[in-house]
């Protein structure tokens, strides 16, 4: 790596869909590599595939990057000196470079119709060959070209691949790579409507924006030799470095597909479910990387410090949603109570009923139990609004009907009634006093108190549940179950 050259990486999505976990990982790794090397991270939008662009596609990319706290040094929202940062605003630049290649006879006009090209493609497949352009238009004379232009026959511009050579690069993830030009075709660089193709526009952008390193998914491996060939023809991007990240697979071993609607894999999904951005960044960091000390919980700052592109795996990496949930739960546990309340509160959609006014205590009750904030709604319902019947709970735990259990609950009620201050510490003292007075412990102590006071056989920390329910409701609940026992 040239120590005197400023490291500049880029994330260059197309606004053809929502922000996918694969694209987000690419953005993160580019950000980490740049920041580890005191460089710049640039975001630009490659929107020249106009027919596939979706509404709000650009916003989904930029706003969700911001939510993840991956802040670019330059982007359409905070432009620097090397814009524009949206390709459709750069069309004259591409046209100029394409005309340069045409003038230097490194590109040529192609008048072939889509129907002709499709016919040739099918014939190649039928003959067992890889479809390639047959260079019909490369041999056109100047007079033939002039006649076609005069007759307004549409044409695209194709780049002429040099024959009988090899294109090589040292991939910082995969090592030495080599592709013979016999495996390539002459690619279209400018469509008949004047719109550049991906492989042409991207090299112009990378040069103009002084990009030093291109880190992207392995699906771009087939694009790299074309981009290197165009770079060489234009005499640009001489020292640019490529790195191709491993594919992300699902638990069945198949490549992650955006069409698999059963698997949530868009950043918007995680955001709406109530995952924290810190947890998602942490999870993405581990998609292809691991730490030498097996540490799995990282902050973004720690990820920058520890990032080493040479340790990125070349093998497929598995998207494990349960692992993401575990990482998220660990990040919630590390949050301060006030930060957790602020984060989780907007996700509470259940009618809190008698719990209103105790929202903060209710939210904190489940801090150590959730992977994403929306889960709190079900836990609130389960804990406070879905009581079990006395008959049902006694069927599971018959000892709850015994006389000594009834006496334990009466002691518990009496202790609560005499309690001067209603707080969690005092409630814990009451439970301890019941333990000493009755000689009960473990399940024989805590299960009756939980069931009689909350009408639920399981839930979060008992003293906290009792505190939130309130003295009057707890005593009322306990007495109603005693009545069901014929007391």
Curated annotation (Swiss-Prot):
Q: Cite the EC number.
A: 6.1.1.17
Q: What keywords appear on the UniProt entry?
A: Aminoacyl-tRNA synthetase, ATP-binding, Cytoplasm, Ligase, Nucleotide-binding, Protein biosynthesis
InterPro entries with a match to the protein in the record: aa-tRNA-synth_I_cd-bd, aa-tRNA-synth_I_codon-bd_sub2, aa-tRNA-synth_I_CS, aa_tRNA-synth_I_cd-bd_sf, Glu-tRNA-ligase_bac/mito, Glu/Gln-tRNA-synth, Glu/Gln-tRNA-synth_Ib_cat-dom, GluQ/Sye
MF (Gene Ontology): ATP binding; glutamate-tRNA ligase activity; tRNA binding; zinc ion binding
User: Can you list the GO cellular component terms from the UniProt entry?
Assistant: cytosol
Task: For this entry, list what GO says about its biological process.
Answer: glutamyl-tRNA aminoacylation
Q: Which residues form the signal peptide?
A: none
Residues binding ATP are: 258
Which major enzyme category is it? ligase
In chain numbering, motif 'HIGH' region lies across 13-23
State where the protein is found. Answer: Cytoplasm
Determine if Aminoacyl-tRNA synthetase is one of this entry's keywords.
Answer: yes
Membrane-spanning segments? none
Q: Where is this motif: 'KMSKS' region?
A: 255-259
Catalytic activity as recorded in UniProt: tRNA(Glu) + L-glutamate + ATP = L-glutamyl-tRNA(Glu) + AMP + diphosphate
UniProt keyword Chloroplast present: no
Do you know which HAMAP family this protein is assigned to? Answer: Glu_tRNA_synth_type1 (MF_00022)
* Quaternary structure (record): Monomer.
Name the protein family.
Answer: Belongs to the class-I aminoacyl-tRNA synthetase family. Glutamate--tRNA ligase type 1 subfamily.
- Known function: Catalyzes the attachment of glutamate to tRNA(Glu) in a two-step reaction: glutamate is first activated by ATP to form Glu-AMP and then transferred to the acceptor end of tRNA(Glu).
Listed name of the protein: Glutamate--tRNA ligase
Q: Gene behind this chain?
A: gltX
